[in-house]
Amino acid sequence: PQLTLNQEGVTLHTTRLPIVYWHEIDYVGERVSDNTPVLAVFVKDVELYCQRITNEKMRNNFLSLLNKHGSNRVMNISLNDLDYDSDELQDIFKMAVARNLEQ
């Protein structure tokens, strides 16, 4: 599976699920229950994907990529499987953000 992120939302490409379109997606910046900073992807009120980003600078860098260079700015994050633990996902995001900030 692969997450494609742009300023309008997220497209999830996977062999098991249909393509998710940006208008079906909502982001949340934190979980109200415990104020934990997260980037969560909801599709039709189902939490499809959630990544804790506890580092505020990294979270802001990541979110700024969604707006960089307008709507043609797309960030692809390849995922071998959706069943990553939070530490593994954190590392994937760190690498993806670093690569995209260099461009």
Positions of the model-derived regions?
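Conserved beta-hairpin
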Residues: 1-29
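Generic domain-boundary/flexible-linker signal
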Residues: 21, 36, 50-52
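Short acidic, Gly/Pro-enriched loop/turn segments at secondary-structure junctions
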Residues: 32-42
